[in-house]
Curated annotation (Swiss-Prot):
GO CC, one annotated term: cytosol
Molecular function terms from GO: aminopeptidase activity; metal ion binding; metalloexopeptidase activity; phosphoric triester hydrolase activity; proline dipeptidase activity
Documented EC number(s): 3.4.13.9
Protein name (record): Xaa-Pro dipeptidase
Cofactor comment: Binds 2 manganese ions per subunit.
Source species: Shigella flexneri serotype 5b (strain 8401)
Catalysed conversion reaction: Xaa-L-Pro dipeptide + H2O = an L-alpha-amino acid + L-proline
Residues at which Mn(2+) 2 binds: D246, D257, E423
Length: 443
């Protein structure tokens, strides 16, 4: 297996090539990429947790240090000014010496406002990529060159195609997240609260709650019907019925995003439904290949949902085709089948059809689908179908011509379990699909 250092060297070569092409297309000399800055809580003297600019961590695995700068031109070795203040109030990260530092020129930046004297004098044709636009203006960057849309669209489009270095990092993130899921299931089985299950997860992954790539969804019982439930009750429920965990990890800035659902008992209808959703998810992944629209797989899973609704007699006296045609599957799976994954959990360019940023929206029937791309080798996506029992979505169906097809008694019996979601992270290759999650034996 190639070392991370050799993979990184090739990764940088790829980023340099993309940068050269972008600069030539948009007639710029270089890009100045800002890691970001700390911002204080309103009327307070402590900052919000720092989140690095994803375009910055695409180049270097520096994710916790504000006030850093990268200058890249696609030709010369990337230059990193690494913030290294004299500070006895806060932790100061040492100047990095790691697998990646041979391929980047690393320079200490002792003062956050000292970058101006270190940059090239002629800056009118440098593009700035970052959050703090006023800082770019102070440095003499032209307003039209601050986050230039064409450049960002171009870079975002090609971020869809992961380098071997990026895939190696994402496989490591998978390992961390899988460890967390196993620890969380054990905590659930022992009767812990959502709050304590979350602590078990973070401990197993080696993350703080500000390190995970998104807020963990730790949902017991009916809380599993809230798609992005992040409350974390401190008290365990009197009766444990179900547990939905949607939680990831991050390695060198790259995310994992996994979901599993467990039934407290193995011999009820809900447990069988969990198994069936899992089986259908795996069956869908087995059909995936390059050259097919991601939208097609979303639509196909609605057909699989219809099959399960009929099997479990949740919808009765209606064909599977009619269920999908009339959107009776919609209230049971109101989100998309998944999304691109990478430096960001909901990674960029899900709707871009080319490197000019041409946008193809989700189908009107499925507005929450986050990707309309044709699958190509190098893409990484989540596949995360679900079935939920959400009253606000079911309520409109309680009246009207289709109400009689809903088995309301069965639905009421399943509502206390909340819902089900099963999520794996897959890589599209030329001749196969790699399931990074199942390769680690996470059931």
């Amino acid at each position: 297996m190639e070392s991370l250092a050799s993979l990184y060297k090739n990764h940088i070569a790829t980023l340099q090539e993309r940068t050269r092409d972008a600069l030539a297309r948009f007639k710029l000399d270089a890009l100045l990429i800002h890691s970001g800055e700390l911002f204080n809580v309103f009327l307070d003297d402590h900052p919000y947790p720092f989140k690095v600019n994803p375009q910055f961590k695409a180049w270097v695995p520096v994710t916790q240090v504000p006030n850093c700068w990268l200058l890249v031109d696609g030709v010369n070795k990337p230059k990193l000014w690494f913030y290294l203040p004299v500070d006895y109030w806060h932790n100061v990260e040492p100047l990095p010496t790691s697998f990646w530092t041979e391929d980047v020129e690393v320079i200490a930046l002792p003062k956050a406002d000292g970058i101006g004297s270190l940059l090239p004098a002629a800056r009118g044709n440098i593009g700035y990529i970052g959050l703090v636009q006023e800082r770019a203006l102070q440095l003499g960057i032209e307003a039209s060159n601050i986050n230039p849309k064409g450049v960002i669209d171009y870079l975002h489009y090609y971020r869809s195609f992961k380098t071997e270095y990026e895939l190696a990092c994402m496989r490591e993130a998978q390992k961390m997240a899988v460890n967390g899921h196993r620890a969380a299931e054990e905590a659930f089985r022992s009767g812990m609260s959502e709050f304590d299950i979350n602590i078990a997860y973070l401990t197993a992954t080696g993350h703080r709650d500000t390190d995970v790539p998104y807020s963990n969804i730790v949902a017991l019982n009916e809380h599993a019907a809230v798609l992005h439930y992040t409350k974390l009750d401190h008290q365990a429920p009197e009766e444990m019925r179900s547990f939905l965990l949607d939680a990831g990890a991050e390695y060198n800035g790259y995310a994992a995003d996994l979901t599993r659902t467990w039934s407290a008992k193995s011999d009820n209808d809900y447990a069988q439904l969990v198994k069936d959703v899992n089986d259908e998810q795996l069956a869908l992944i087995a059909t995936m290949k390059a050259g097919v629209s991601y939208v097609d797989y979303h639509i196909q899973f609605h057909q699989r949902i219809a099959k399960l609704l009929r099997k479990h007699q949740i919808i009765t006296d209606m064909s599977e085709e009619a269920m999908v045609e009339n959107d009776l599957t919609g209230p049971f799976m109101p989100h998309g089948i998944g999304h691109p994954l990478g430096l960001q959990v909901h990674d960029v360019a899900g709707f871009m059809q080319d490197d000019s940023g041409t946008h193809l929206a989700a189908p009107a029937k499925y507005p929450y689908l986050r990707c309309t791309r044709i699958l190509q080798p190098g893409m990484v996506l989540t596949i995360e179908p679900g079935i939920y029992f959400i009253e606000s979505l079911l309520a409109p169906w309680r009246e009207g011509q289709f109400s009689k097809h809903f088995n309301w008694q069965k639905i009421e019996a399943l509502k206390p379990f909340g819902g089900i979601r099963i999520e794996d992270n897959v890589v599209i290759h030329e001749n196969n699909v790699e399931n990074m999650t199942r390769d680690l034996k996470l059931a």
